[in-house]
């Protein structure tokens, strides 16, 4: 355990964790002596302390000690010191890297328990529902014992059940369902329909898998189906006529495009003059998808065909991505390629990336066995540091040097020979593959040798945990894709240790060293023996895509047996580092584009939340009328180029669009008497009179006091419709942005400018369309919908504030803010005094109607009148403590002094952590920021915030990597790495 308390080369967070661990260990005997009832009752005591103004960190040591003791009693497992260390790091909002088998699930119990005491909900995110159910059941026993409730959120649950699960103190859920529930919550028409209750604290299991590997994959809710199978079939038919000389594939980026020969063939096939004319953009889009589906994507690698459907395969885990499909027509292109039924193409209704969803949580932490290599990305994107937690027992697994062969055939033959050799002595072996097709090839070769084995890939993942759990038995041969049962321990059968433990055989290097380390980590858990080795060939994708393949293969392609020498190993490591950097750049690009959409999405969702709460829309409708009139008077058939008004067109337009319900004749109010400078104000007053005096009275007659529900429905549905059209357009804009590089402009800048313009149109158009709908609101269907909402028995509670009051509050003056700050400071004075007393080990333990009970030190209790000013109480308590100290022995005084020094050291380390941590990405509070609110509601120019400077443009510009030009740099990296092969 010497390493455990070695402070050298440890982060500030770990140093703080060591200090806190010492204090937690000192509480062991105290809580260990409690009865079950008293131990469980600590939850109520902690909640009272929090209600009285204490912070989580004030009760952290005690809460961790209680959780540790409860875990020991309920699960029969006493958390190791390293598990408590990991839990402390998680509570700090960072990533805890704990090696496989070190007990991450147990380590999560104390931080989850502590944060659940706030009563705001804690979410534990897992990579699949099996792990969510398993951990909720096991850890839930501890939480239930301590008086907390536990819920499991599942995909198939209805809204009411989901709401119940989210209302539990602690909710376990697969990560994708959390994001989809968030999107669905922002599509409801009643606040009571939401299932989530705010995003407080989330602990992510296998955090690297979710926040790194899946960061590029957006969550999408689709709808509005369009069925055009003939277009996909014709594009597929055209692509099948092409030969290799008709297109160009970038092996590194997997990008594909037609060359001049291919363009000529496309023009002839589709009867076009110029394929790339703007009116042919839809054909270009279909051809591009067909090219990618037929020439780049491989069956049983990126996808499989299952039950007549295309099923996506996660490239990092090997799992089927259930319920997922490609968007923007790529799914249909694959269906055409495979001769399957072509499903209707859908449009995007709501979307968010994992990066931006998880950044919405007030506090975020994660645990995994492999994250240190990606620490910079965790810091840059999520403001989370990675802390490597020491193992409970020394790691004794042997990681052998890679075996590199010239060809895939030679590699596979060597793998089978190695499996035969290892299997003869009964040692279990786990073979890790990166692709389904590789696992099936090796399986067939093992069958030919008569070697019984089990295969686990995307086609047989239902029994994942069971198959992986058995991989540690004698004579077991298991083939698994990269999923490798993360989260499931492989327990060695008795006698296997003497055989050398579990043998891990990797058949391909992944696109990240972290993924390789995950595979290795299946062996050598908790000090077990084990061995790992990778068998690689020069024909593997890593060599093909990220080295100068022709030169490397030319030099080593004729080698028989394993290739010797440091250089080839160094080239492999350099290629792996290169693809890690490339993928990081890709994820940053996705995030930069999504951040533009995020700002717009946050504005819309904040606006929806306000619309769901208010009960009087009059002020809101007045503002929309102003916007609508601005739009009407911007039409060039009404305001002519010479700034003259075409009154007849204006009157006809108003009668056609705004008088269907009232049959009001705008030609009889003297519009033609108003010049252009007075017309705007005149029309606003007329429309306000028509709506509030006539139309609203019809609503009140039909719906009584709940007429505002009809207004809410119309305004929300209009906003949603415009937003859904907007994001569908933005998705297509993003996918085509890179095609405009010929204009010598940054694609990101073009995307930002266009997205901003389109958002401004969305804001204006949603206001105008809402006014048109409100002025024509005689639709019985809408009224019946409102009546249905009101009669479903749901209790809907809304604040009494009117829209005007909300807006007045939001745009409060600086003087009011200053006054509020002064008041807040005064209110914090008692908290400050109590903190000072806490440092002296003086704390309030109970508060009655007339008296308060204070504790001095460990045992002295004092009753003081509640009405007594706090500063007077402070003087009395400090004086009594001084008297108590004078009666103490020197040994007791020294102990107290040592404890006070520890507290000071902890505070210093906490301040150090605060100072060294990078600034967290600040999100605009759109509900409380007057500028953001005004921009959305009142249509102020939103573009200024979005446009990037030329300097930012250069920073965001993506660097293209050319394989041929990169050879010298690769050689340099390889030679440097060869000097230190253990890097």
UniProtKB/Swiss-Prot annotation:
Region (Disordered): 948-983
Keywords noted in UniProt: ATP-binding, Cell membrane, Cytoplasm, Membrane, Nucleotide-binding, Protein transport, Translocase, Translocation, Transport
Residues that hold ATP according to the record: 83, 101-105, 489
Enzyme Commission code(s) on record: 7.4.2.8
SMART domains with a match to the protein in the record: SecA_DEAD, SecA_PP_bind
Catalysed reaction, written as an equation: ATP + H2O + cellular proteinSide 1 = ADP + phosphate + cellular proteinSide 2
Enzyme class, UniProt record, top EC level: translocase
Pfam families: P-loop_SecA (PF21090), SecA_DEAD (PF07517), SecA_PP_bind (PF01043), SecA_SW (PF07516)
GO biological process: intracellular protein transmembrane transport; protein import; protein targeting; protein transport by the Sec complex
Residue ranges, compositional bias (Polar residues): 973-983
Membrane-topology annotation of the record: Peripheral membrane protein
GO terms for MF: ATP binding; protein-exporting ATPase activity
Keyword Membrane applies: yes
An annotated GO cellular component: cell envelope Sec protein transport complex
InterPro entries, per the entry: Helicase_ATP-bd, Helicase_C-like, P-loop_NTPase, SecA, SecA_CS, SecA_DEAD, SecA_motor_DEAD, SecA_preprotein_X-link_dom
Compartments where located: Cell membrane; Cytoplasm
Family: Belongs to the SecA family.
NCBIfam families with a match to the protein in the record: PRK09200.1, secA
Binding partners and assembly: Monomer and homodimer. Part of the essential Sec protein translocation apparatus which comprises SecA, SecYEG and auxiliary proteins SecDF. Other proteins may also be involved.
Name of the molecule in the record: Protein translocase subunit SecA
The organism of origin for this protein: Mesomycoplasma hyopneumoniae (strain 7448)
């Amino acid at each position: 355990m010497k390493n455990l308390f070695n402070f050298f080369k440890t982060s500030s967070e770990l140093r703080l964790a060591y200090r806190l661990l010492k204090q937690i260990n000192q509480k062991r005997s105290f809580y260990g002596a409690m009865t079950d009832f008293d131990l469980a009752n600590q939850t109520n005591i902690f909640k009272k302390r929090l209600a009285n103004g204490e912070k989580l960190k004030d009760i952290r040591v005690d809460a961790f000690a209680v959780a540790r003791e409860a875990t020991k009693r309920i699960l029969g497992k006493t958390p190791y010191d390293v598990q408590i260390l990991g839990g402390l790091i998680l509570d700090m909002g960072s990533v805890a890297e704990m090696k496989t088998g070190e007990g991450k699930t147990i380590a999560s119990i104390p931080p989850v328990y502590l944060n659940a005491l706030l009563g705001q909900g804690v979410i534990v995110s897992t990579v699949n529902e099996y792990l969510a159910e398993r951990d909720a059941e096991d850890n839930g026993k501890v939480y239930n014992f301590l008086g907390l409730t536990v819920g499991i959120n599942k995909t198939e649950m209805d809204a009411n059940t989901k709401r119940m699960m989210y209302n539990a103190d602690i909710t376990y859920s697969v990560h994708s369902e959390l994001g989809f529930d968030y999107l669905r919550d922002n599509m409801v028409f009643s606040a009571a329909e939401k299932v989530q209750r705010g995003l407080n604290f989330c602990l992510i299991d296998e955090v690297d898998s979710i926040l790194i590997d899946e960061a590029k994959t957006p969550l999408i809710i689709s709808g509005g189906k369009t069925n055009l199978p003939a277009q996909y079939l014709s594009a597929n038919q055209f692509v099948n006529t092409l030969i290799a000389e008709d297109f160009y594939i970038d092996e590194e980026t997997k990008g594909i495009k037609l060359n001049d020969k291919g363009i000529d063939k496309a023009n002839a096939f589709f009867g076009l003059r110029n394929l790339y004319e703007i009116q042919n953009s839809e054909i270009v889009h279909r051809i591009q998808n067909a090219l990618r589906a037929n020439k780049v994507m491989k069956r049983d690698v990126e996808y499989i065909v299952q039950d007549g459907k295309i099923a996506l395969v996660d490239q990092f885990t090997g799992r089927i991505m259930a319920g997922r499909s490609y968007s923007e027509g790529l799914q249909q292109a694959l269906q055409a390629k495979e001769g399957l039924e072509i499903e209707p193409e859908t449009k995007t209704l709501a979307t968010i990336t994992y990066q931006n969803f998880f950044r919405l949580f007030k506090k975020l932490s994660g645990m995994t066995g492999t994250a240190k290599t990606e620490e910079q990305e965790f810091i840059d994107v999520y403001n989370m540091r990675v802390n490597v937690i020491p193992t409970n027992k020394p790691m004794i697994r042997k990681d052998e040097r890679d075996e590199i062969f010239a060809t895939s055939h030679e590699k596979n033959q060597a793998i089978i020979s190695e499996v035969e050799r290892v299997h003869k002595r009964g040692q279990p072996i786990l073979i890790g593959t990166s692709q389904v097709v590789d696992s099936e090839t090796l399986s067939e070769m093992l069958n030919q040798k008569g070697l019984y084995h089990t295969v686990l890939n995307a086609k047989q993942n239902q029994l994942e945990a069971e198959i992986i759990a058995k991989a540690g038995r004698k004579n077991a041969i298991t083939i698994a894709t990269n999923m490798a049962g993360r989260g499931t321990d492989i327990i060695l059968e008795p006698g296997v240790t003497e055989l050398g433990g579990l043998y891990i055989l990797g058949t391909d290097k992944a696109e990240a060293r972290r993924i390789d380390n995950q595979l290795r980590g299946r062996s050598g858990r908790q000090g077990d023996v084990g061995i790992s080795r990778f068998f690689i060939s020069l024909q593997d994708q890593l060599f093909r895509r990220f080295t100068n393949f022709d030169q490397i293969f030319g030099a080593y392609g004729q080698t028989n047996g394993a290739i010797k020498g440091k250089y080839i190993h160094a080239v492999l490591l350099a290629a792996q580092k290169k693809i890690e950097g490339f993928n990081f750049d890709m994820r940053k690009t996705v995030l930069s584009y999504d951040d533009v959409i995020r700002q717009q999405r946050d504005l819309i969702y904040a606006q929806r939340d306000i619309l769901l709460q208010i009960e009087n829309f009059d002020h809101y409708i007045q503002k929309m009328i102003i916007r609508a009139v601005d739009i009407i008077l911007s039409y060039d058939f009404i305001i002519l180029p010479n700034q003259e008004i075409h009154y007849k067109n204006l009157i006809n337009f108003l009668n056609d669009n705004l008088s269907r319900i009232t049959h009001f004749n705008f030609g009889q109010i003297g519009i033609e008497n108003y010049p252009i400078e007075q017309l705007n104000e005149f029309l606003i007053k007329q429309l306000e009179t028509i709506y509030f005096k006539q139309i609203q009275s019809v609503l009140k007659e039909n719906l009584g006091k709940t007429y505002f529900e009809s207004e809410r429905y119309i305004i929300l549905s209009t906003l949603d419709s415009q937003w859904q059209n907007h994001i569908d357009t933005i998705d297509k804009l993003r996918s085509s942005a890179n095609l405009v590089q010929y204009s010598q402009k940054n694609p990101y800048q073009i995307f930002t400018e266009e997205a901003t313009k389109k958002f401004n149109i969305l804001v204006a158009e949603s206001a105008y369309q809402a006014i048109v709908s409100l002025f024509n609101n005689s639709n019985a269907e809408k009224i019946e919908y409102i009546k249905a909402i009101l009669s479903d028995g749901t209790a809907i509670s809304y604040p009494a504030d009117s829209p005007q009051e909300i807006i007045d509050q939001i745009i409060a003056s600086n003087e009011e803010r200053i006054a509020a700050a002064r008041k807040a400071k005064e209110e914090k004075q008692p908290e400050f005094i109590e903190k000072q007393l806490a440092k002296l080990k003086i704390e309030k333990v109970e508060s009655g109607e007339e008296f308060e009970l204070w504790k001095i030190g460990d045992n002295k209790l004092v009753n003081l009148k509640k009405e007594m000013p706090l500063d007077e109480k402070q003087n009395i308590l400090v004086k009594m403590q001084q008297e108590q100290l004078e009666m103490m022995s020197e040994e007791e005084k020294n102990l107290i002094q040592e404890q006070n020094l520890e507290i000071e050291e902890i505070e210093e380390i906490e301040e150090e952590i605060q100072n060294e941590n990078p600034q967290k990405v600040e999100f605009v509070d759109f509900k409380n920021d007057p500028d953001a609110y005004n921009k959305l509601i009142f249509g102020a120019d939103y573009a200024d915030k979005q446009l990037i400077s030329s300097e930012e443009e250069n920073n965001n510009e993506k660097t293209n990597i050319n394989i041929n030009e990169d050879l010298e740099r690769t050689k340099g990296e390889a030679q440097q790495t060869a000097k230190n092969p253990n890097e």
